[in-house]
Amino acid sequence: MKWNLVTFADDKFLNRQKYIEEYAKSLDIGTYSYSHSWFKKQDFYKKYKNILLDKTGLGYFLWKSYIINDAINQMEDGELLFYTDVGDIFHEDLIPFVEEVIEEDSCLLMVGNSINKDWTRRDCFVYMDCDEEDYWDSNQLEAGISFWRVCDESKKIISEWLEYACDRRIISDDENVGGKDNFPSFQEHRWDQSILTNLAIKHGLSVAPQDIRSYIECNYDYWYERYANGGAPMHRPIDTLLQQKKGEMMKLYES
């Protein structure tokens, strides 16, 4: 199975993007590296400036579904698209693990520990026609890493993700206008992640088993902070990789 890594970075994180891109190439993974400066030149950016000019997530992370949609439509059926935030890192054994688990599914998504209604504005539920208990009480996904098998079904889901993300009522931090209040336990909206979670529940999309976390580390700068204080895990393959690459990766974190 041919793998393709998709990443995005603004000027502040171009060094991290370059690092993970070179790492992916060393594993014979293709790369689709998008920059914020490139994104701002697209007609799409001009059309949705009302969302994309917001400083939160460079426009509530709307760019994420856009670049994934752009990249997957350049790939051949049967290939695998792997999106990751540039602040994350993965162990090479992730590749056979995902290939075994994903099988013929259209995608493989990461589930977190947070409850969806605690991190999703009510309008996101309302305007996605997802204002029901199943959506409220499910665990929210983590959109910083996702895997997509290139096929018609995955393209349709990503296109739907992008379509909902273009609706400011759904993706933004604005006050609700749909006539319903946020839940009492609401903390903060999670933008693209809230949308993807609702879609995953609606379409019954596959989520990865917890074992996948043996091969990935999200926000590796935080891992090094815990490592310095003696609080980082040390038993996973990804922990070994982080120890081996500490010097070079800490330079990325500090620069």
Residue ranges and their predicted role:
Residues 1-255:
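Glycosyltransferase catalytic domains, chiefly GT-A lineage
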